[in-house]
Design a protein with these regions (language model features):
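Alpha-helix N-cap recognition
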Residues: 68-71
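Short aromatic-glycine-(Arg/Gly/Cys) micro-motifs in beta-strand/loop hairpins
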Residues: 33-62, 79-81
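Negatively charged, low-complexity tracts enriched in Asp/Glu with abundant Ser/Thr
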Residues: 1-30
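Short intrinsically disordered terminal tails
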Residues: 1-2, 77-81
Length: 81
């Protein structure tokens, strides 16, 4: 059976303006915390990108950056295969 991926909107205390986040749950278990980059300290091209702030299990140690939320989702799905 294919694992079920769900996302929960959450605000993340990052110490910057990057607060918009998503908990990534795989079959109800926390797999990652994604954060949308919005701080003016980032390069303009990076603003709006999504970053794996923290990963667990198969995403442990993966601090990847994605141009969009959809790209992040696609990468997580590929890593589950």
């Amino acid at each position: 059976m294919r694992p079920q991926i769900t996302f929960q909107i959450i605000e993340v205390l990052t110490g910057s303006e990057d607060r918009e986040g998503r908990l990534v749950l795989v079959d109800g278990r926390l797999a990652a915390v994604l954060v949308r980059l919005s701080d003016q300290g980032h390069e303009p091209l990076l603003r709006g990108a999504w970053y794996i702030e923290a990963g667990f299990g198969f995403l442990d140690g993966r601090h990847e950056l994605f141009a969009s939320f959809d790209e992040a989702v696609a990468s997580i799905e590929r890593n589950l295969s």
